[in-house]
């Protein structure tokens, strides 16, 4: 029994390290770092969309390989943004007692939807909308 409990504790500790801000809660927060990271992820998404457009239609193996890698990169960075919103802001930083609660929820939702749209297509307008949503959310959050 103790062995199973120790194994479970170790697994959960490892899982927590891999998948999100600690959720202890540790009280160590870096809001500006999270916004910087989301904007960096958005820039990567925008670059990926451009590269996907450039590589589409090419038939050589290298282009096919690069195309699939850029698609995966776009998906990954959009998911990272959604994870930051869900696991950092929504669960730890946005409080229902805040006067800005509704505006913050709307802003967080807009970021998550914009990231989802980036996953669904390759229109650079979606990447631009994502950047605007992040900046708008940051503006409300930092007021």
Predicted regions and their residues:
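Sec/Tat signal peptide C-region and signal peptidase I cleavage site
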Residues: 15-21
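Secondary-structure edge/capping motif, primarily at the C-terminal ends of alpha-helices
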Residues: 49-63, 92, 115-125, 141
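Sec-dependent N-terminal signal peptides
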Residues: 5-14
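Immediate post-signal-peptide N-terminus of mature secreted/exported proteins
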Residues: 21-61
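Alpha-helical segments in soluble extracytoplasmic regions
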Residues: 49-88
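Short, charged, amphipathic alpha-helical segments
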Residues: 65-72, 101-105, 127-133
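C-terminal amphipathic alpha-helix
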Residues: 35, 109-143
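Short, solvent-exposed, charged loop/turn and helix-capping segments
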Residues: 81-101
């Amino acid at each position: 029994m103790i062995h199973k409990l120790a194994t479970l504790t170790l697994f959960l500790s490892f899982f927590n390290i891999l998948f999100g801000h600690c959720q202890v809660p540790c009280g160590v927060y870096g809001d500006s770092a999270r916004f910087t990271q989301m904007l960096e992820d958005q820039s990567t998404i925008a670059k990926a969309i451009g590269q996907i457009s450039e590589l589409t239609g090419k038939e050589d193996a290298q282009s096919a390989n690069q195309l699939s890698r850029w698609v995966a990169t776009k998906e990954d960075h959009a998911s990272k943004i959604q994870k930051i919103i869900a696991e950092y802001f929504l669960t730890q930083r946005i409080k229902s007692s805040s006067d800005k609660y509704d505006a913050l929820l709307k802003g967080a939702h807009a970021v998550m939807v914009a990231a989802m749209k980036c996953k669904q297509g390759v229109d650079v307008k979606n990447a631009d909308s994502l950047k605007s949503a992040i900046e708008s959310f940051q503006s409300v959050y930092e007021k």
